[in-house]
Amino acid sequence: MGTLPRELMQISHSDASGHNPTRSGAARYFDYESAVALRNLAAAYGTDMPRYLLAPEVAVLLSRVPDLRKRLFIDALWNTGGRLNEILPLTKEDFVLDDPLTGAPLSSPFVVMRTLKQRRLEEAARSRRRGRGRPTREEQQAERETEAEIRDNPPRAVPLTDPGFVQRLREWFVTAGLPASARLWDIKSEDTARSWISQAVAAAARDGVTFSIRPVTPKTFRDSFAMHLVQHQVPQKVIQTLMGHKDAKSTEWYTRVFALDVTRQLGVRFSMDPYEASRLLLPR
Protein backbone atom coordinates (compact mmCIF):
# COMPACT_ATOMS: atom_id res chain seq x y z
CA MET A 1 0.00 0.00 0.00
CA GLY A 2 1.56 3.25 -1.12
CA THR A 3 0.67 6.14 1.16
CA LEU A 4 -1.05 4.52 4.12
CA PRO A 5 -0.62 6.89 7.08
CA ARG A 6 1.75 5.33 9.58
CA GLU A 7 -0.28 6.74 12.48
CA LEU A 8 -3.23 4.51 11.62
CA MET A 9 -1.57 1.29 12.73
CA GLN A 10 -4.26 -0.13 15.01
CA ILE A 11 -5.12 -3.73 15.72
CA SER A 12 -8.82 -3.24 16.36
CA HIS A 13 -10.95 -4.58 13.54
CA SER A 14 -12.52 -1.28 12.70
CA ASP A 15 -11.28 1.58 14.86
CA ALA A 16 -8.74 4.08 13.54
CA SER A 17 -6.95 6.36 15.95
CA GLY A 18 -4.40 9.08 15.53
CA HIS A 19 -1.92 7.98 18.16
CA ASN A 20 1.79 7.77 17.51
CA PRO A 21 2.38 4.11 16.49
CA THR A 22 5.86 4.05 17.97
CA ARG A 23 4.60 4.87 21.45
CA SER A 24 1.05 3.65 22.01
CA GLY A 25 -1.92 1.69 20.74
CA ALA A 26 -1.66 -1.27 18.44
CA ALA A 27 2.00 -0.69 17.64
CA ARG A 28 2.83 -2.29 20.98
CA TYR A 29 1.53 -5.63 19.77
CA PHE A 30 1.09 -5.33 15.99
CA ASP A 31 4.26 -5.08 13.91
CA TYR A 32 2.85 -3.53 10.75
CA GLU A 33 6.11 -3.39 8.81
CA SER A 34 6.89 -7.06 9.49
CA ALA A 35 3.34 -8.02 8.53
CA VAL A 36 3.68 -6.19 5.21
CA ALA A 37 7.08 -7.78 4.56
CA LEU A 38 5.65 -11.25 5.22
CA ARG A 39 2.71 -10.62 2.90
CA ASN A 40 5.08 -9.45 0.17
CA LEU A 41 7.17 -12.57 0.69
CA ALA A 42 4.09 -14.76 0.36
CA ALA A 43 3.09 -12.96 -2.84
CA ALA A 44 6.55 -13.52 -4.30
CA TYR A 45 6.47 -17.17 -3.23
CA GLY A 46 3.59 -18.01 -5.53
CA THR A 47 0.00 -17.40 -6.48
CA ASP A 48 -1.39 -20.10 -4.18
CA MET A 49 -1.43 -17.82 -1.15
CA PRO A 50 -4.23 -15.78 0.45
CA ARG A 51 -4.67 -12.25 -0.86
CA TYR A 52 -5.44 -10.24 2.25
CA LEU A 53 -5.48 -6.76 3.72
CA LEU A 54 -4.05 -5.85 7.11
CA ALA A 55 -6.06 -4.20 9.89
CA PRO A 56 -4.66 -0.67 9.30
CA GLU A 57 -5.49 -0.92 5.60
CA VAL A 58 -9.07 -1.96 6.30
CA ALA A 59 -9.45 0.87 8.82
CA VAL A 60 -8.35 3.42 6.22
CA LEU A 61 -10.65 1.88 3.59
CA LEU A 62 -13.64 2.01 5.94
CA SER A 63 -12.90 5.64 6.77
CA ARG A 64 -13.49 6.48 3.09
CA VAL A 65 -17.11 5.22 3.15
CA PRO A 66 -19.46 8.05 4.22
CA ASP A 67 -22.63 6.01 3.63
CA LEU A 68 -23.30 4.22 6.93
CA ARG A 69 -25.18 1.31 5.35
CA LYS A 70 -22.39 0.61 2.87
CA ARG A 71 -19.74 0.98 5.54
CA LEU A 72 -21.57 -1.44 7.83
CA PHE A 73 -21.70 -3.98 5.00
CA ILE A 74 -17.92 -3.88 4.48
CA ASP A 75 -17.47 -3.81 8.26
CA ALA A 76 -19.55 -7.00 8.52
CA LEU A 77 -17.44 -8.78 5.90
CA TRP A 78 -14.30 -7.86 7.83
CA ASN A 79 -15.59 -8.63 11.32
CA THR A 80 -17.22 -11.97 10.53
CA GLY A 81 -15.26 -13.49 7.65
CA GLY A 82 -18.58 -14.40 6.07
CA ARG A 83 -19.06 -15.39 2.46
CA LEU A 84 -20.98 -12.87 0.37
CA ASN A 85 -24.01 -15.17 0.15
CA GLU A 86 -23.93 -15.47 3.97
CA ILE A 87 -23.68 -11.72 4.62
CA LEU A 88 -26.33 -10.41 2.23
CA PRO A 89 -29.28 -12.32 3.80
CA LEU A 90 -28.40 -11.27 7.37
CA THR A 91 -31.25 -9.81 9.39
CA LYS A 92 -31.37 -7.92 12.66
CA GLU A 93 -32.39 -11.09 14.52
CA ASP A 94 -29.28 -12.90 13.26
CA PHE A 95 -27.20 -10.58 15.47
CA VAL A 96 -27.40 -11.64 19.12
CA LEU A 97 -26.21 -8.58 21.03
CA ASP A 98 -28.41 -8.70 24.14
CA ASP A 99 -29.53 -11.32 26.63
CA PRO A 100 -32.93 -12.57 25.39
CA LEU A 101 -34.26 -12.81 28.97
CA THR A 102 -32.94 -9.65 30.63
CA GLY A 103 -32.21 -7.45 27.63
CA ALA A 104 -28.78 -6.64 29.07
CA PRO A 105 -25.90 -6.29 26.59
CA LEU A 106 -23.99 -9.54 26.18
CA SER A 107 -20.31 -9.54 27.07
CA SER A 108 -19.76 -11.88 24.12
CA PRO A 109 -22.16 -10.88 21.34
CA PHE A 110 -22.26 -12.97 18.19
CA VAL A 111 -23.88 -13.36 14.79
CA VAL A 112 -25.49 -16.53 13.45
CA MET A 113 -24.19 -17.30 9.97
CA ARG A 114 -25.92 -19.63 7.52
CA THR A 115 -24.54 -20.94 4.26
CA LEU A 116 -26.65 -20.86 1.13
CA LYS A 117 -27.31 -24.60 1.53
CA GLN A 118 -28.42 -24.17 5.15
CA ARG A 119 -30.85 -21.40 4.22
CA ARG A 120 -32.33 -23.50 1.43
CA LEU A 121 -32.80 -26.45 3.78
CA GLU A 122 -34.51 -24.26 6.38
CA GLU A 123 -36.75 -22.69 3.74
CA ALA A 124 -37.69 -26.14 2.41
CA ALA A 125 -38.63 -27.24 5.93
CA ARG A 126 -40.77 -24.11 6.45
CA SER A 127 -42.48 -24.62 3.09
CA ARG A 128 -43.45 -28.17 4.00
CA ARG A 129 -44.82 -27.07 7.36
CA ARG A 130 -46.95 -24.45 5.60
CA GLY A 131 -48.41 -27.10 3.29
CA ARG A 132 -52.09 -27.93 3.58
CA GLY A 133 -53.61 -31.29 4.34
CA ARG A 134 -52.13 -34.46 5.69
CA PRO A 135 -48.65 -35.12 4.23
CA THR A 136 -48.15 -38.31 2.26
CA ARG A 137 -45.72 -40.97 3.41
CA GLU A 138 -43.23 -39.74 0.81
CA GLU A 139 -43.58 -36.16 2.04
CA GLN A 140 -43.07 -37.26 5.65
CA GLN A 141 -39.91 -39.11 4.64
CA ALA A 142 -38.64 -36.07 2.73
CA GLU A 143 -39.31 -33.89 5.77
CA ARG A 144 -37.38 -36.24 8.07
CA GLU A 145 -34.46 -36.24 5.64
CA THR A 146 -34.47 -32.44 5.47
CA GLU A 147 -34.54 -32.13 9.27
CA ALA A 148 -31.67 -34.62 9.55
CA GLU A 149 -29.65 -32.57 7.06
CA ILE A 150 -30.33 -29.41 9.05
CA ARG A 151 -29.09 -31.14 12.23
CA ASP A 152 -25.96 -32.32 10.41
CA ASN A 153 -25.33 -28.84 8.96
CA PRO A 154 -26.09 -26.39 11.77
CA PRO A 155 -25.44 -22.65 11.36
CA ARG A 156 -22.32 -21.29 13.00
CA ALA A 157 -22.00 -18.58 15.62
CA VAL A 158 -19.25 -16.05 14.99
CA PRO A 159 -18.27 -13.89 18.00
CA LEU A 160 -18.23 -10.14 17.48
CA THR A 161 -15.07 -9.17 19.31
CA ASP A 162 -14.81 -5.55 18.19
CA PRO A 163 -16.83 -3.20 20.47
CA GLY A 164 -16.74 -0.48 17.81
CA PHE A 165 -18.48 -2.70 15.27
CA VAL A 166 -21.10 -3.80 17.81
CA GLN A 167 -21.82 -0.16 18.65
CA ARG A 168 -22.24 0.71 14.97
CA LEU A 169 -24.65 -2.20 14.60
CA ARG A 170 -26.73 -0.91 17.51
CA GLU A 171 -26.77 2.61 16.08
CA TRP A 172 -27.81 1.36 12.64
CA PHE A 173 -30.61 -0.78 14.08
CA VAL A 174 -32.02 2.33 15.76
CA THR A 175 -31.45 4.64 12.79
CA ALA A 176 -32.88 2.29 10.16
CA GLY A 177 -35.77 1.08 12.32
CA LEU A 178 -35.76 -2.29 10.58
CA PRO A 179 -38.09 -5.11 11.65
CA ALA A 180 -36.27 -8.05 13.24
CA SER A 181 -36.77 -10.24 10.17
CA ALA A 182 -35.82 -7.62 7.56
CA ARG A 183 -32.52 -7.85 5.74
CA LEU A 184 -29.92 -5.27 6.69
CA TRP A 185 -28.91 -4.86 3.07
CA ASP A 186 -31.93 -5.32 0.84
CA ILE A 187 -30.10 -5.43 -2.47
CA LYS A 188 -30.91 -7.69 -5.38
CA SER A 189 -27.52 -8.26 -6.96
CA GLU A 190 -24.15 -9.36 -5.61
CA ASP A 191 -22.65 -6.97 -8.16
CA THR A 192 -24.12 -4.08 -6.18
CA ALA A 193 -22.27 -5.27 -3.08
CA ARG A 194 -19.04 -5.55 -5.05
CA SER A 195 -19.52 -2.05 -6.44
CA TRP A 196 -19.74 -0.64 -2.90
CA ILE A 197 -16.26 -2.00 -2.21
CA SER A 198 -14.98 -0.62 -5.51
CA GLN A 199 -16.37 2.81 -4.60
CA ALA A 200 -14.50 2.72 -1.29
CA VAL A 201 -11.24 1.76 -3.02
CA ALA A 202 -11.74 4.56 -5.55
CA ALA A 203 -12.39 7.08 -2.76
CA ALA A 204 -9.17 6.01 -1.04
CA ALA A 205 -7.27 6.35 -4.32
CA ARG A 206 -8.49 9.93 -4.70
CA ASP A 207 -6.85 10.62 -1.32
CA GLY A 208 -3.61 9.04 -2.51
CA VAL A 209 -4.10 5.72 -0.70
CA THR A 210 -3.62 2.63 -2.85
CA PHE A 211 -3.66 -1.07 -2.00
CA SER A 212 -1.27 -3.73 -3.21
CA ILE A 213 -4.14 -6.25 -3.28
CA ARG A 214 -6.12 -5.75 -6.48
CA PRO A 215 -8.96 -6.06 -6.94
CA VAL A 216 -10.38 -5.78 -3.43
CA THR A 217 -13.41 -8.08 -3.36
CA PRO A 218 -15.72 -9.63 -0.73
CA LYS A 219 -13.39 -12.66 -0.73
CA THR A 220 -10.52 -10.33 0.19
CA PHE A 221 -12.21 -9.52 3.49
CA ARG A 222 -12.91 -13.18 4.23
CA ASP A 223 -9.22 -13.96 3.69
CA SER A 224 -8.25 -10.88 5.72
CA PHE A 225 -10.45 -12.01 8.63
CA ALA A 226 -8.78 -15.42 8.66
CA MET A 227 -5.27 -13.96 8.44
CA HIS A 228 -6.09 -11.47 11.22
CA LEU A 229 -6.94 -14.43 13.46
CA VAL A 230 -3.79 -16.30 12.44
CA GLN A 231 -1.69 -13.22 13.19
CA HIS A 232 -3.12 -13.19 16.70
CA GLN A 233 -2.34 -16.89 17.24
CA VAL A 234 -5.95 -18.07 17.36
CA PRO A 235 -5.82 -21.90 17.25
CA GLN A 236 -6.31 -23.39 13.81
CA LYS A 237 -9.29 -25.49 14.95
CA VAL A 238 -11.06 -22.36 16.18
CA ILE A 239 -10.38 -20.57 12.90
CA GLN A 240 -11.76 -23.58 11.02
CA THR A 241 -14.99 -23.36 13.03
CA LEU A 242 -15.36 -19.60 12.59
CA MET A 243 -14.73 -19.85 8.85
CA GLY A 244 -17.20 -22.70 8.43
CA HIS A 245 -14.61 -25.00 6.87
CA LYS A 246 -15.53 -28.68 6.82
CA ASP A 247 -12.03 -29.65 5.73
CA ALA A 248 -9.05 -28.59 7.86
CA LYS A 249 -7.00 -28.26 4.67
CA SER A 250 -9.03 -25.18 3.77
CA THR A 251 -7.86 -23.54 7.00
CA GLU A 252 -4.26 -24.69 6.60
CA TRP A 253 -4.14 -22.55 3.46
CA TYR A 254 -4.00 -19.49 5.73
CA THR A 255 -1.46 -20.82 8.22
CA ARG A 256 0.86 -21.74 5.36
CA VAL A 257 1.84 -18.08 5.01
CA PHE A 258 3.39 -18.05 8.47
CA ALA A 259 5.48 -21.12 7.73
CA LEU A 260 7.61 -18.73 5.66
CA ASP A 261 8.37 -16.73 8.79
CA VAL A 262 8.56 -19.40 11.49
CA THR A 263 12.34 -19.70 11.66
CA ARG A 264 12.70 -15.95 12.19
CA GLN A 265 10.02 -15.92 14.88
CA LEU A 266 11.54 -18.84 16.77
CA GLY A 267 15.13 -17.77 16.25
CA VAL A 268 16.07 -21.08 14.59
CA ARG A 269 19.69 -21.21 13.36
CA PHE A 270 21.48 -24.02 11.52
CA SER A 271 25.06 -22.74 11.57
CA MET A 272 27.46 -23.15 14.47
CA ASP A 273 30.95 -21.94 15.16
CA PRO A 274 33.37 -24.82 14.30
CA TYR A 275 35.50 -24.15 17.38
CA GLU A 276 32.50 -24.34 19.69
CA ALA A 277 31.30 -27.46 17.90
CA SER A 278 34.70 -29.13 18.28
CA ARG A 279 34.72 -28.45 22.00
CA LEU A 280 31.42 -30.30 22.29
CA LEU A 281 32.53 -33.28 20.23
CA LEU A 282 36.17 -33.82 21.23
CA PRO A 283 37.04 -35.50 24.54
CA ARG A 284 38.26 -33.17 27.24
Task: Give residue spans per PLM region.
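C-terminal secondary-structure termini that scaffold catalytic or DNA-interacting sites
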Residues: 1-38, 45, 49, 129-141, ...
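Residue-level marker of regulatory loop/turn positions in helix-turn-helix DNA-binding domains and
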Residues: 50, 65-66, 76, 210, ...
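C-terminal catalytic core of tyrosine-transesterase DNA break-rejoin enzymes
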Residues: 75, 220-246
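Active-site/catalytic core of tyrosine-dependent DNA strand-transfer enzymes
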Residues: 133, 137-144, 154-212
